[in-house]
Amino acid sequence: MKLKPRFLFHANAAAIGGRIAKPKDLAIDTPAASSLTAAGGRSTSKAENGRIGEVIQFGSASTFAEGLFDNLGKWAETLCGDSCEDALTATTRVSSEVRNLTVNAKATFTARRINGGFVAKSPKGSGEPSISLDRDTVFDGVALGGYKLIVELNAALFQRFDTLSKLRTAADTPKFVKEHGAGLFMKASVPGRTTASAAGRFVESGGTIYGTIVKSLRWAGKPYPGAEIDDNVITIPDCGDIYFGEIYISAYRRRLTMLRMDLCCPQPMRLMMADTEDNGGWSG
């Protein structure tokens, strides 16, 4: 049997998704989504001036995924000769964007632009791919009930520490915990912890670390009446929670959900905006 190592590309993006429970069960058919085959290539999708039920309106929703070997000529030689492609490098890019978004809830949520994504490099000796936050990741023009919000991101953290091993090594130093621990909830009181960790410890399950790319979430002026901000979450009284910039980090993949809305008004719903996942690895 002739079997040579090959790179298996992997990237997914969805602009809008979720489920609205009432008055009629609505599983959202995402208006824009992209996914790569294991051979790589490119996948793009875009929708404009869309409406989902009576809840969501958007000016545009788009996704992009691309996986390519960095040297076309050398990759072509592996197909026509005896050399193996595991000596080559590959890059996978993925992004998702929503523009002019309106979510009609108890407090109307609006955003001029939400964009998130990753750039991944194929694994080398460590076996871990480098996966860094795309430089165009941004929240722009965000407001709740007309009250403007400022969402400041800590992009540098998720660009510099682009592998899980780098992140774990850095986490053993007090300086890292002091500077970046908040973005990884290292000292937070969370379900499953009896008390907050004094030294700092990841919120982790099954080898996947939970964090946020949000450095600061604050009101530009007066706050929405009764709303509370805790880290990257806004809680709306008698309505629900809005999560900004959630990131999931494991040894071989990273996933970013730019916006998650768990609401019960005007009806129960979970919505996600600009969701991306990136990784890739060798077949053996």
Enumerate the predicted regions with their spans.
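Extended, solvent-exposed, non-transmembrane regions
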Residues: 1-284
